């Protein structure tokens, strides 16, 4: 057996019906498009969301919300990520050096997710209440 001799099992691949090839094919003449109308024409059909001229749903409903541009430069730091930083002092630069946050991040907040076992000094980051308690319980400090 070679790769060039492989073929699917007999009868496993059925050829698709060809349109416009006689009345006996079941898809002759109009080819399954019906008679006349926009959808029977070549290039016919309507865009997504078009409702025949009626005001479409996406325009009937009101606009809402926005995307804060600050969210693109803000990151959440898990407690478990603090152990990945070398030296025991955690700030924006050491987090970037450890590839925990991207270089475009300007603000970060430490949240209570995971565990911290080694004492660390958190400098210049915002810290949630639960994360603050966990860091101090592990013997760490928080410097504003």
Swiss-Prot record:
GO cellular component, one term: cytosolic large ribosomal subunit
Family statement: Belongs to the universal ribosomal protein uL15 family.
Listed name of the protein: Large ribosomal subunit protein uL15
Superkingdom, taxonomy of origin: Bacteria
Function according to Swiss-Prot or TrEMBL: Binds to the 23S rRNA.
GO biological process, one term: translation
Single GO MF descriptor: rRNA binding
UniProt KW keywords: Ribonucleoprotein, Ribosomal protein, RNA-binding, rRNA-binding
UniProt organism field: Enterobacter sp. (strain 638)
Biased segments, Gly residues type: 21-31
Matches recorded under InterPro entries: Ribosomal_uL15, Ribosomal_uL15/eL18, Ribosomal_uL15/eL18_sf, Ribosomal_uL15_bac-type, Ribosomal_uL15_CS
PANTHER family: 50S RIBOSOMAL PROTEIN L15, LARGE RIBOSOMAL SUBUNIT PROTEIN UL15M
Known partners and oligomeric status: Part of the 50S ribosomal subunit.
Pfam families named in the record: Ribosomal_L27A
HAMAP family linked: Ribosomal_uL15
Stretches for region Disordered: 1-54
């Amino acid at each position: 057996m070679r790769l060039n001799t492989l073929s699917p099992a007999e009868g496993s691949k059925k050829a698709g019906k060809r349109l416009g090839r006689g009345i006996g094919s079941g898809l002759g003449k109009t080819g399954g498009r019906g008679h006349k109308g926009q959808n029977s024409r070549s290039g016919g059909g309507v865009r997504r969301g078009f409702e025949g001229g009626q005001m479409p749903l996406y325009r009937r409903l009101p606009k809402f919300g926005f995307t804060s541009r600050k969210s693109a430069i803000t990151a959440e730091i898990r407690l478990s990520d603090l152990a990945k930083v070398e030296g025991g002092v955690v700030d924006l630069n050491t987090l970037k050096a450890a590839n925990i946050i991207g270089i475009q991040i300007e603000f970060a907040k430490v949240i209570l997710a995971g565990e911290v076992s080694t004492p660390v000094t958190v400098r210049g980051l915002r810290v949630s209440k639960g994360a603050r308690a966990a860091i101090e319980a592990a013997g760490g400090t928080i410097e504003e």
